[in-house]
Amino acid sequence: MRPYLFKVGNFELRVYSLMYILALFRAIFLAKHDKLAKKRGITDNKQIEDFAFITLFSGLIGARIYYVILKWDYYSKMLYEIPMVWKGGLAIHGGIIGGIIAILIFSKMHNKKFFVLTDMSVGPLILGQALGRIGNFANGEIHGVPTFTPWSVIISGKFSTWWNLYNSLPLSEQAKYRPLVPWGVVFPENTSAGMEFPTYPLHPAMLYELVLNFIAFLLIWFVFIKKEYKRGILSMIYLILYGIIRIFVSAFRAEDLLIYGFKMPYIVSAIMIICGIVGIVIINKRTE
């Protein structure tokens, strides 16, 4: 596993960057073939392309700013690394905020309904998130905790206590615990996963999310979108689906920021789920 497909001199075609390029073109393709969006007046292909570029660019900026804020202790000392998005370091919650800002501006500039645009965006967005996790895997980031810990310990949040106890054991005793969980991924030592947990098999949390995001895309694109819900319902379904996915995956992630003992994604994802449920109730009470 390596972060680039090939290297010529100082140039590297990084998997992470390639996945976002693929996500952009896939988003344009899906938006142009979104029958529900066409019924709602989104028919100009040039406008769709402009919308995709603007929202992706704004989403990347939002994702990077959010990530840098969360990791400010590091980036305050390494300011020159802030623009280096091709090396990884994007936070999806910040990307969603950045995308929403772009959609608000675009809807005002082109006289389009805000929720028509967000409903058109959620399918390509969740598929793009799945592709992005392939790049995370290549970079060895968004990794999970070691898989030799019992599942109940990971989910209960007591991993750090168990990890300290494990490290206090002699190497011969540590070896007895490794077969307890049958699988995992050992990442190269030059990745964030390899530096934090060298030589240990880790839960591939980014691959868990890849699979779940792709399932969510299939549900949105082939099930929910065909139901032709009221404007905004599809967007609320996305908030609920991704909120649930992120809470599940965060149970296995090692890198998530803690706020007063709670993982930050738990808090943000819970807010997403609540907003989605409340949004569905409010939208269903209104008239088109």
Can you say where each PLM-predicted feature lies in the sequence?
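A feature for loop-to-transmembrane-helix boundaries and adjacent hydrophobic helices
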Residues: 1-288
